[in-house]
Design a protein with these regions (language model features):
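Glycine-rich anion/phosphate-binding loop at the beta-strand->alpha-helix junction
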Residues: 24-178
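A generic structural signal for short, non-catalytic loop/turn and secondary-structure boundary residues
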Residues: 4, 13, 49, 154-158, ...
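Flexible, glycine/charged-enriched surface loops at secondary-structure junctions
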Residues: 2-11, 49-61, 100-104, 138-146, ...
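Hydrophobic alpha-helical segments with strong N-terminal bias
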Residues: 15-16, 120, 197
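Short secondary-structure boundary micro-motifs
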Residues: 10, 115-116, 192
Length: 237
């Protein structure tokens, strides 16, 4: 591999099995295929030396699946985005009072826990899917990457919006990033080159998701959610 560097191999014994979790730094690549190939070579070597059988994929890495493991331990990039908006701007642009935002914030996480959903957010997957398609990412990874934690906090003369995305498998080299249109979009974002270009892309995606979470929260709290859909969606059909 031109990008992969083995950091460690974690061991998780269960029943009469041992799960080996290969942890790699994949540079600016998302790295799923890279890790798979590296793990195959390592497991073949272990089998040759010990005679132990193995399955390359156990499901423990939660690839393309939402899991508590990836929320806690992360997979790929982990990003926290935060912004503070003044009360006057919240009222003028988002058309909502901070007190209404706080009321909805009390309700949303409670009902989500009742439903058994993972994470506390509204629709992170919308932002991720759009940008993943535009920048050549593996859109199937939205299933695991869209689990996050959205929070608001009242501050002096404003409100702080905060979003944590603990598991983002994105890259700026390899895979769909080689496509011409996707390369052009990465250039527009300033993520087509540089040592930390994949980190920058992850930050942009998280910030975009935060903006979308803020918008939907405001629409729901101010009871304008349906109105917006009727004006910009159904009325055009």
């Amino acid at each position: 591999s031109n990008y992969g560097k083995l950091l460690r191999v974690d061991q998780y014994p269960i029943q009469n099995y041992v799960i080996l979790d290969f942890v790699l730094d994949t540079g600016n690549a998302a790295g799923q295929n890279m890790v798979t190939l590296a793990a195959k070579v390592a497991c073949d070597y272990i089998k040759e030396k010990t005679g132990a059988d193995f399955f390359l994929e156990s499901g423990f890495n939660s690839d393309k699946k939402a899991s508590a493991r990836n929320m806690i331990m992360g997979r790929g990039h982990s990003v926290i985005a935060e912004t503070t908006i003044k009360s006057s701007i919240v009222q003028r642009i988002l058309n909502v009072d901070i007190s209404e935002l706080e009321k909805y914030q009390e309700l949303g996480p409670t009902t989500s826990r009742l439903a058994g959903t993972q994470g506390t957010h509204l629709h992170i997957s919308n932002a991720l899917t759009a940008i993943y398609l535009a920048t050549g990412q593996d859109t199937a990874c939205v299933a695991e990457n869209s689990i996050g934690h959205f929070q608001i906090e009242s501050v002096n003369d404003g409100v702080k919006f905060r979003l944590t995305l603990p598991s983002m498998t994105v890259g700026t080299v390899g895979g769909g990033t080689r496509l011409l249109a996707q390369q052009q979009n990465l250039k527009l974002l300033g993520c087509h080159e540089g040592e930390n270009s994949s980190k920058k892309l992850a930050e942009i995606i998280c910030a975009s998701a935060l903006a979308l979470e803020t918008s939907l929260l405001s629409a729901l709290a101010s009871d304008t959610f349906t109105k917006a859909h009727m004006k910009y969606g159904l009325s055009l059909i």
